[in-house]
Amino acid sequence: MDFVANLSPLALAYVGDAVYELLVRAHLVGRGPAKPEQLHREALKYVRATAQARVVPALEEYLTPAEKDILRRGRNARPGHLPRTAAPAEYHSSTALESLLGYLYLQGDWARVEELAHLIFKLAEQD
């Protein structure tokens, strides 16, 4: 059995949240010098559940069937709480995205994580 495939979607999202945060920070720092407070404000534009949820529909067409399955499992996961800053559907979509990133990271597929991150940033910056 595949250990990673058997993890709960919420466990995958827990890891994926950290992976995504790191990717966003590296992306922003890579743009050039900025003050930490500016970087933090800019990072919020990417990491908020509403921002993550906006890119998921467009991202889906680039996913493999296995990745779409992980995304679906993440979307259907039911955490014990929902944040007040996002609608339930947005939060579930952001959990789905984080589940996918966590899954790929734990599978050791960093190249795919970076490929999807590049696409996510491109989609996010179109808004």
UniProtKB/Swiss-Prot annotation:
It is found in: Cytoplasm. GO terms for cellular component: cytoplasm. Its main location: cytoplasm. Keywords: Cytoplasm, Endonuclease, Hydrolase, Magnesium, Nuclease, Ribosome biogenesis, RNA-binding, rRNA processing, rRNA-binding. The keyword rRNA-binding applies. GO terms for biological process: rRNA processing. PANTHER family: MINI-RIBONUCLEASE 3 (PTHR34276:SF1). Involved in correct processing of both the 5' and 3' ends of 23S rRNA precursor. Processes 30S rRNA precursor transcript even in absence of ribonuclease 3 (Rnc); Rnc processes 30S rRNA into smaller rRNA precursors. Belongs to the MrnC RNase family. This is Mini-ribonuclease 3. It comes from Moorella thermoacetica (strain ATCC 39073 / JCM 9320).
